[in-house]
Amino acid sequence: MYRALTRDIEVTVEPYYLEEQSDPDDSRYVWGYRIIIANHSGLAVRLMTRYWHITDENGQVDEVSGPGVIGEQPLLNPGDTYEYSSGCPLDTPSGVMFGHYSMEAEGGETFDVAIPAFSLDSPGLVRTLN
C-alpha cells in the first residue's frame, strides 16, 4: 500500500493487476486500484476534482483530470472515510501513477491533497519504477 498525508487528509492506494482484462500479446495491461481517503482533520471537506499523471515504462505520459471520482464529489466530515475503486490500462507491462485531489473545506477554502506515486507492475516483472 502507498500513503500520503496532506493537511490531515490521508490518501491510501492499493494497486492490483487485472489479469483477466489484460492481453500481453496485444500490448494491453490493465490494473485496478483501491483508494481510501480519510479525513483526520477537524473540518468537513468535499472532493471537487481529480488529477492523475500516468507514465508508462517507455516514458509516455497521460494526464487525466475531471470533476470528482467515479461520478461523485463526496463530502467527508471529520473522522469520515471514503473508498472507491477504478482502473488504468497501459500499453506496457509497467508504469507509475500519482496525482492530487482538489478539496473544498467548509468555509470555501480550496487546497490540493496528494495522491502518492504508486507502481503498476505486471506479475513476474523484475524491475519497478518506484
UniProtKB/Swiss-Prot annotation:
Signal sequence segment: none
InterPro entries, A to Z: ApaG_domain, ApaG_sf, Uncharacterised_ApaG
PROSITE patterns: APAG
Pfam families assigned to the protein according to its UniProt record, in alphabetical order: DUF525
One GO biological process term: error-free translesion synthesis
All copies of domain ApaG, residue ranges: 3-127
Xref: PANTHER family: F-BOX ONLY PROTEIN 3, POLYMERASE DELTA-INTERACTING PROTEIN 2
Protein name according to UniProt: Protein ApaG
Source species: Rhizobium meliloti (strain 1021) (Ensifer meliloti)
